[in-house]
UniProtKB/Swiss-Prot annotation:
InterPro entries: D-isomer_DH_CS1 (IPR029752), ThiF/MoeB/HesA (IPR045886), ThiF_NAD_FAD-bd (IPR000594), Ubiquitin-activating_enz (IPR035985). The lineage of its organism: Eukaryota, Metazoa, Chordata, Cephalochordata, Leptocardii. Zn(2+) binds at C224, C227, C301, C306. It comes from Branchiostoma floridae (Florida lancelet). E1-like enzyme which specifically catalyzes the first step in ufmylation. Activates UFM1 by first adenylating its C-terminal glycine residue with ATP, and thereafter linking this residue to the side chain of a cysteine residue in E1, yielding a UFM1-E1 thioester and free AMP. Activates UFM1 via a trans-binding mechanism, in which UFM1 interacts with distinct sites in both subunits of the UBA5 homodimer. Trans-binding also promotes stabilization of the UBA5 homodimer, and enhances ATP-binding. Transfer of UFM1 from UBA5 to the E2-like enzyme UFC1 also takes place using a trans mechanism. This is Ubiquitin-like modifier-activating enzyme 5.
């Protein structure tokens, strides 16, 4: 049972939260974080500008127009270990509006993760998140929903909010981020997004807390969550029957933070159109392994909306004008006597070969050839020019002349 001091502390916290809400409802410019709302982002480098380092991305040529981030609306489903950090990162980046969905409450068991604080125990996660996030950045607009999206009534309301809850009016949100920890909620998000053709990013951390992943899902273009479901989903097993009393999944704030970082990084690249969006990125902490791939949709997917969108996407591709095939310039093979196109060049020059061909070649028996002919020197040429041979003299006469010398 709570002590008097604990109750008094709790009352004080609630009074502070109530005062923040009153200030916000009165239209005050102070968002609760001690600074006034900023109407327009500035790149001015001063200590009082919370956006100066973000706007530096423009100066460095990374993003063309970072200010556009204030025009985007993102829905985050699940405000736990990954979702709360994701919401915080997007808030610090200056996102226009966040829709937060979660039915759970903050517990002391959540303190091993990031974001939540012990004094927030007992508050709903979406309420605690909104209070903290408003203090961080009062320029962001928040919309919170404290319910389970998998029930029939709540599912319909969830679909309505992601299709009409945009910052700019009655239109769909720009992106849905799944940060839930169960397959039932993932399938609900998958169904809603397939039905509305909504792009979303799924994320998850393993039960042993040392691996995780993110997956971008564009209905009809990439594989949805039902195209290649986990074994638990494919087998039709109720997840609730797998839980045991006194047993819980492991949780590391490091893995949660890494997966949340990947999720937000991909979100920024998708919204602000810079870099390459990774359609699937995994993380294995044991080997520091980061696999990435693109997953094609399953033509036999159980979700009828997915197969319908696949057909529409293929028809759209066929309707696009075909790109003319570019003629590839084939490099001329230097030397076709080998597989590498290597040109064989002799070390002896043409002049040296020509000079060598005039040298003296001795008479050898058949089958034996000289390997090298000594080029004729100038003295050899002069001697050869002054040498005359009389073919009329016999061998005996020549020998007689030699003896007389």
């Amino acid at each position: 049972m709570a002590t008097v001091e604990e109750l008094q502390t709790r009352v004080k916290q609630l009074e502070e939260e109530l005062e923040r809400e009153r200030t916000r409802n009165r239209g005050g410019t102070d968002g609760g974080g001690g600074r006034k709302k900023i109407d327009q982002m500035s790149s001015e480098v001063v200590d009082s500008n919370p956006y100066s380092r973000l706007m530096a991305l423009k100066r460095m040529g990374i993003v063309d127009n970072y200010e556009r981030i204030r025009d985007f609306t993102v829905a985050i489903v699940g405000v736990g270990g990954v979702g709360s950090v994701t919401a915080e990162m997007l808030t610090r980046c200056g996102i226009g509006k966040l829709l937060l969905f979660d039915y759970d409450k903050v517990e002391l068991a959540n303190m091993n993760r990031l974001f939540f604080q012990p004094h927030q125990a007992g508050l709903s996660k979406v309420q605690a998140a909104e209070i903290t996030l408003r203090d961080i950045n009062p320029d962001v607009e928040f919309e919170t929903h404290n319910y389970n999206i998998t029930t029939v009534d709540n599912f319909q309301h969830f679909m309505d909010r992601i299709s009409h809850g945009h910052l700019k009016g009655d239109r769909p949100v720009d992106l849905v981020l799944s940060c839930v920890d169960n397959f039932e909620a993932r399938m609900a998000i998958n169904t809603a997004c397939n039905e509305q053709g909504q792009v979303w990013i799924e994320s998850g951390v393993s039960e042993n807390a040392v691996s995780g992943h993110i997956q971008v899902i564009k209905p009809g273009e990439t594989a949805c969550f039902a195209c290649a479901p986990p074994l638990v989903v494919a087998s039709g097993i109720d997840e609730k029957t797998l839980k045991r009393e006194g047993v819980c999944a492991a949780s590391l704030p490091t893995t949660m933070g890494i997966v949340a970082g990947f999720l937000v990084q991909n979100t920024l690249k998708y919204l602000l159109e810079f870099g390459s969006v990774t359609y699937y990125l995994g993380y294995n902490a044991m080997q520091d392994f980061f696999p990435s791939m693109a997953m094609k949709p399953n033509p036999n997917c159980d979700d009828s909306f997915c197969t319908k969108l696949q057909t529409e996407y293929q028809e759209k591709l066929l309707a696009q004008p075909k790109e003319e095939a570019k003629e590839e310039t084939v490099e001329e093979v230097v030397h076709d006597a080998n597989d590498w196109g290597i040109e064989l060049v002799a070390e002896t020059t043409e002049e040296e070969l020509k000079a060598a061909s005039h040298g003296h070649v001795p008479e050898l028996v058949e089958g034996v050839h000289v390997a090298y002919v000594r080029p004729m020197t100038q003295e050899d040429e002069e001697g050869a020019a002054g040498l005359t041979v009389d073919d009329q003299e016999s061998l005996e006469d020549l020998m007689a002349k030699m003896k007389s010398i």
